[in-house]
From Swiss-Prot:
Zn finger intervals (TFIIB-type): 37-68
InterPro entries: Cyclin-like_dom, Cyclin-like_sf, TFIIB, TFIIB_arc, TFIIB_CS, TFIIB_cyclin, Znf_TFIIB
Official protein name in the record: Transcription initiation factor IIB
Classification lineage: Archaea, Methanobacteriati, Methanobacteriota, Stenosarchaea group, Methanomicrobia
Known function: Stabilizes TBP binding to an archaeal box-A promoter. Also responsible for recruiting RNA polymerase II to the pre-initiation complex (DNA-TBP-TFIIB).
Biological-process GO terms, alphabetical: transcription preinitiation complex assembly
Amino acid sequence: MEEIERIREIERTEQEKIKERIKLQREKEKEEELDKYTVECPECGSRALVRDYERAELVCSECGLVIDENFIDQGPEWRAFDHDQRMKRSRVGAPMTYTIHDKGLSTMIDWRNRDSYGKTISSKNRAQLYRLRKWQRRIRVSNATERNLAFALSELDRMASALGLSRNVRETAAVIYRRAVEKNLIRGRSIEGVAAAALYAACRQCNVPRTLDEIAEVSRVSRKEIGRTYRFVSRELSLKLMPTSPIDYIPRFCSGLNLKGDVQAKGIEILRQAAEKELTSGRGPTGVAAAAIYIASILCNDRRTQREVADVAGVTEVTIRNRYKELAEELNIEIIL
């Protein structure tokens, strides 16, 4: 019996060694695969490479070196000149996305009662199609976890649409929320609160800052709960978020006030001078940005009132008056009202 046990132990050890070797081999192959796609310029080491599809060349945008000639075009073999042509000729589905609970990998049955050729489904087959559509919806969301994730991601998309946020911000917010779900951070907290906190964190990560008041306005939870949940999630997920800079708010505020490009450039210049003298630290970034825009609009003869700037920035007129007086005094800016 002891001999049999010893043989079995040796066999188990050998099997573990084989598994370990296979695992190491797979990791090595994965690293080689990644190295194949992370190309850098052999001359200057830059990764800012541009693919010129007309000449079939891979060019470094920093030093101009042609790294590869006659590379293979991995795009479609067909040509399309508008959106309708692209939709007709495309033979693949939408790209994978984190903003859908199943990452967009499942299929769905269209609500229109038409076949693949665009012909109307006969009346005797509509009942069957209705049942197929119903079961397809049930299969896509099969358990409570998927149902909650689908609800949270739809809530994220609704808030992002209301704030006019871009696709990359939505994807980042969805990834943050999924990480929170994996770490079981949702327990004891509302789904809407965690979704709003994830969106706020994504805005800061993507340098498209939105204030807590703006997030709270489009969500169904209070500003206090969003702030508390955001601090908890960012701490547990170790999110590296830099403090928001007033400069990040300048383009959006100028766009809301219909100001010209020179006013925006002047506002950024004022804020950079203020940052050098540490006038922006310890103050709300929206108030400082609003004051810089107010000063820039006067200097560029494209004046806006304090009330107009305050409405767009979401601050009070008193805040703008206090901040612009500080900036004008410390930076020696002469303002003629």
